[in-house]
Amino acid sequence: MSATMPSTVADRAWRELHEAATAPYKKGGSFAWHFARGKLGRDPVFRGLLERGLIEVEHERVVDIGCGQGLFASLLASMSAMQKQGRWPSTWFPTAPRPAYTGIELMPKDVARAQASIGHLEPKPTLLCADMCSAELPDCDLVVILDVLHYVDLQAQEAVLVRVRDALRRGGNFRARLLLRVGDASSRRGFAISQWVDRTVTRIRGHKVSPTWGRPLSEWTALLESLGFRVRSMPMSEGTPFANVLLVADLEQNEAA
């Protein structure tokens, strides 16, 4: 019984987090609410970040590039509330009590849904309708980029990552981190499926489908290392047919100084 107890506690806590983080989207309309519930419930990355301790208590200033309707901001706020109320599982690592969130999203419809749904959160999230290739990035401790960097060409990808590195460096946090989920183009079948689903979801959300530029995992890793990151990779497509990989890129200490 003791062997299953931690999982039971964690599952119950995750269900509570899911309800709390998605409830605000009822104010954004039926689509916003159902999309939030499906995304948080079916995409393994959110719970994976939490249970692996990849969002640390030192990560107070968070930048979410390609934030969509701001689901990550709502999750962070719900995590903080659960900890404050003393219902945080002992197997989960603590996170920042009052994270300062900046979300950057190109699509005006998504930003509007985010404003309608989570604009009331405290601290108030900063939600910018802007292009990640040109948006000003504030000094920060943690940058999250999930499944969006492939929408710009290879040169632009590197330019975005250079600016991310510089924003983390300016933040001066020795725990500075980039969480980057990408598709591994060397896994042809999984990558093709993920691209097809990506295009389908983009259409459903009412957006124009753009061309994409992928890289093999080895190239993503080499690029990040050349920019001064220490990189480890984790499969992050459990329960799906995709070839998604999470790259945990910690800024080398001499880069953060």
Task: Locate each region found by the language model.
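Short catalytic micro-motifs in class I SAM-dependent methyltransferases
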Residues: 147-148
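Conserved S-adenosyl-L-methionine
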Residues: 66
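A conserved beta-strand element that flanks and buttresses the S-adenosyl-L-methionine
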Residues: 144
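Helix-capping/helix-break motifs at membrane-protein junctions
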Residues: 153-154
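Class I (Rossmann-like) S-adenosyl-L-methionine-dependent methyltransferase catalytic domain
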Residues: 2-61, 69-136, 174-257
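A short glycine-rich, Lys/Arg-flanked "PGG" loop and its adjoining helix->strand segment in the class I
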Residues: 158-173
